[in-house]
A protein has these predicted regions:
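C-terminal active-site "lid" helix and adjoining low-complexity regulatory extension at the edge
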Residues: 225, 238-278
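ATP-binding N-terminal substructure of ATP-dependent carboxylate-amine bond-forming enzymes
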Residues: 1-80, 84, 89, 274
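Phosphate-binding site of ATP-dependent enzymes
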Residues: 138-227
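Active-site nucleotide/adenylate-binding loops and adjacent lid/helix of ATP-dependent enzymes
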Residues: 1-3, 7, 68-71, 81-165, ...
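A short glycine-rich, hydrophobically flanked beta-strand micro-motif that places a catalytic Asp/Glu
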Residues: 167-168, 229-240
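Hydrophobic beta-strand scaffold residues
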Residues: 28-29, 73-74, 101, 124, ...
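Protein kinase-like catalytic core scaffold
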Residues: 124, 165, 187-188, 232, ...
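Short glycine-rich anion-binding loops that position phosphate/pyrophosphate groups of nucleotides
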Residues: 55-57, 130-131, 251
Length: 278
């Protein structure tokens, strides 16, 4: 099996995945560096399957589309990357599938965003539709803060900042859950604890093992199916209404979760990739 490894910088996760691939005698790895590749619309690399591990969302998205156009199976697929890379599209997919999530409003102007914030109630969370690692999130506590943040986003922001994705603020009491879905199984989960309202390990949150209960597995698999399935990380909030899906990530990071959970996450990913799962 010739596995194309679509990547940018080789981080800890990529090293772990390459180590797991190297243990498979039937696998030949073909490195596809998105900083060096030149794509041809009429031909593609001689590989059977591609594992996408790009850092840049736009490169991942366009690279996957070009590779799939040549008939190459990609994990995750272009369709999944397209949905997961955009919080609005993710929210729509979850809504269509009936998967519980926090309340969301979308607005395109400062004036309509203020109406949306009044509707959803303060505090609320303002997010860029496209973004990762908990960056450029704003907890908006009142109308004065909202007016200031919206003006800054409108004047200083790119096109993406003119789409106002407004989410209900969920009181997490210092922690949330990240679960890991590989194909049809929720293989592991962690708690992420932080004194800050953004509980992201990239921003210093502490990881500890979270048991994969029937409830965690069910909502994680439902969220994964809603966006198209594959190898995905699902961020969950614990609330009095039950678990809610915050986000679904398609190029998942797991370096802090292997020892924490005792699960060989890269090994499970490679098994799924090589044995034909989508």
């Amino acid at each position: 099996v010739r596995v194309g490894f679509l990547h940018s910088l080789i981080r800890k996760e990529e090293k772990l995945l390459l180590d797991a691939l190297a243990k498979r005698r039937e696998v030949e790895v073909v490195m596809l560096d998105d900083r060096k590749m030149v794509f041809d619309l009429r031909s593609g690399p001689e590989v059977d399957v591609v594992l996408e591990r790009c850092i840049n969302h736009s490169r991942a998205l366009h690279g996957l589309r070009l590779l799939e156009n040549r008939g190459i199976r990609c994990v995750n697929s272009y369709a999944v990357a397209n949905v997961c890379g955009d919080k609005l599209l993710t929210s729509l997919a979850l809504e269509e599938a009936g998967v519980p999530q926090p309340e969301v409003r979308i607005a395109f102007t400062e004036a309509s965003a203020l109406v949306a914030l009044d509707d959803i109630g303060y505090p609320a969370v303002l997010k860029p539709a496209v973004g990762s690692w908990g960056r450029l999130l704003s907890k908006v506590n009142d109308r004065d803060a909202a007016e200031s943040i919206l003006e800054h986003k409108t004047i200083l922001g790119s096109y993406h900042h003119s789409i106002f994705y407004i989410q209900e603020y969920v009181e997490k009491h210092g922690r949330d859950i990240r679960s890991f879905v590989v194909g049809d199984e929720c293989v592991a989960a962690i708690y992420r604890d932080s004194a800050h309202w953004i509980t992201n390990t990239a921003r210093g949150a502490r990881a500890s093992n979270c048991p994969v209960t029937a409830e965690v597995a069910a909502i994680s698999l439902a969220a994964a199916r809603a966006v198209g399935g594959g190898i995905l990380a699902v961020d969950l909030f614990e609330t009095p209404r039950g678990l809610l899906v915050n986000e679904v990530n398609y190029t998942m990071e797991f370096r802090n979760s292997i020892d924490t959970t005792g699960v060989d996450i890269p090994g499970r990913m490679v098994e799924h990739l090589v044995e034909g799962g989508q």
